[in-house]
Amino acid sequence: MQLNSTEISDLIKQRIEQFEVVSEARNEGTIVAVSDGIIRIHGLADVMQGEMIELPGNRFAIALNLERDSVGAVVMGPYATLAEGDKVKTTGRILEVPVGRGLLGRVVNTLGEPIDGKGPIDSDGFSPVEVIAPGVIERKSVDQPVQTGYKAVDSMIPIGRGQRELIIGDRQIGKTALAIDAIINQKDSGIKCVYVAVGQKASTIANVVRKLEEHGALANTIVVVATASEAAALQYLAPYSGCTMGEYFRDRGEDSLIVYDDLSKQAVAYRQISLLLKRPPGREAYPGDVFYLHSRLLERSSRVNAEYVEKFTKGEVKGQTGSLTALPIIETQAGDVSAFVPTNVISITDGQIFLETDLFNSGLRPAVNPGISVSRVGGAAQTKIIKKLSGGIRTALAQYRELAAFSQFASDLDDATRAQLEHGERVTELMKQKQYAPMSIADQSVSIFAAEKGYLKSVELNKIGDFEASLLSFMNSEHADLMKTINETGNYNADIEGELKASLDKFVETQTW
């Protein structure tokens, strides 16, 4: 069949008339640059801030920089096999991690994937890592204690459920030890724990997990790990993942405790990402939003009221408040608490436990400096008996520090000053405590009672530890009912005071230490 020129012309006109111009939004883009875990993508028509972008090989990146003609994203994991020209897709969702009771007793990475070799995790679903913190109306004031098991902390710097208490100090002076002991002390309290390790050596984390297991606390704990060798993106996101896992319990009317070890390394990872994304640097080369990095994380730790829990659980849980208590850790350089990140976190939290190198080196462990350590809201949550007995402890230690410095220059001291110095020395000695040996409320009460009522005056300084060990052994064997009552009620009245006094008088007569 032959077509003449007129027919061909008509056919072309017909085709042109039928042609429709359709604009189609693409959710696929092309990688145009890869370097240091950062990829630059062209062609993504519709992408959210923080959205997960699917990469070749079932990997993901997170969109952080949304620019006019490109998207800057940070790769979650290894990026060596990515190349310019690779196709990527948007997913329409932000990062989510598994949550639920199935995570308790497990060691997971930032994405909630198990890394302990114990098989898959039976989770209750997924939750986004970035959520808005509960509002003022949904919160309840802090009035229940979290016992760390440390005399120095529970007596002078009490922590309440829903509080944010910073642990700050130089490297290698017991910050992690304090936090781990606080977790170990929760094994029978019903408080679920989350330990987030950021930027640490894998061997150090393995040691922590082993210690938790040895002391029976791992079954009650979720360990979230982003080691020093992992991508900066995973180190930056690990605290948010851990927080989401802890919020699962808070929102269902339970109490949980989370340790961020440590936020200095998270800030460094975020600085690295920001500089690679060409964001303008500020003080100490940190980006302008490094305060918001920590504030939006720590504000999620709170005590929520019963209405919030009832609404969240759709009426399944009634009359229960929930809490998420945070113990963020910050590492200082040569005791400089006025650096950028330390001052930021101090201003966000409800108090700080300051550990000092000089105290640690002098043998005082935990090396808590009571002078600049403070708990802004924990006083309302403190156990009654500890609160009543420990009022003079902080004053005695603060005055002792002052007088000890002064006495180095004074040749002769009056009797009152000498008595104050001796009392301060004994209280300082009494505050020493071994690692992995948390004390019950009753044990702490007896020790503080002995110090406050003058029972240590006749004890030699180097025998204080032996005196305390013998006293607690005596009390737990001879006066078990009294100790049980104190542990269960936490009350302090004339009867309990009388019983404590009588039992200490009896013990002092034995001279068995």
UniProtKB/Swiss-Prot annotation:
CDD domains hit by this protein: ATP-synt_F1_alpha_C, ATP-synt_F1_alpha_N, F1-ATPase_alpha_CD
Subunit structure of this chain's protein: F-type ATPases have 2 components, CF(1) - the catalytic core - and CF(0) - the membrane proton channel. CF(1) has five subunits: alpha(3), beta(3), gamma(1), delta(1), epsilon(1). CF(0) has three main subunits: a(1), b(2) and c(9-12). The alpha and beta chains form an alternating ring which encloses part of the gamma chain. CF(1) is attached to CF(0) by a central stalk formed by the gamma and epsilon chains, while a peripheral stalk is formed by the delta and b chains.
Pfam family, one: ATP-synt_ab
Taxonomic source organism: Shewanella piezotolerans (strain WP3 / JCM 13877)
EC nos: 7.1.2.2
Chain positions of site Required for activity: S373
UniProt KW Signal keyword: no
Keywords for the protein's UniProt record, in alphabetical order: ATP synthesis, ATP-binding, Cell inner membrane, Cell membrane, CF(1), Hydrogen ion transport, Ion transport, Membrane, Nucleotide-binding, Translocase, Transport
Top-level division of the source organism's lineage: Bacteria
InterPro entries, per database record: ATP_synth_asu-like_sf, ATP_synth_asu_C, ATP_synth_asu_C_sf, ATP_synth_F1_a_nt-bd_dom, ATP_synth_F1_asu, ATPase_a/bsu_AS, ATPase_F1/V1/A1_a/bsu_N, ATPase_F1/V1/A1_a/bsu_N_sf
Any one GO CC term of the record: plasma membrane
Reaction it catalyzes: ATP + H2O + 4 H(+)(in) = ADP + phosphate + 5 H(+)(out)
Predominant cellular place of this UniProt entry's protein: membrane
Binding site for ATP: G169, D170, R171, Q172, I173, G174, K175, T176
The keyword Disulfide bond belongs to this UniProt entry's keyword annotation: no
Compartments (UniProt record): Cell inner membrane
Entry's family note: Belongs to the ATPase alpha/beta chains family.
Entries under PANTHER family matching the protein: ATP SYNTHASE SUBUNIT ALPHA, MITOCHONDRIAL
Single annotated GO MF: ATP binding
Enzyme class label: translocase
Protein name: ATP synthase subunit alpha
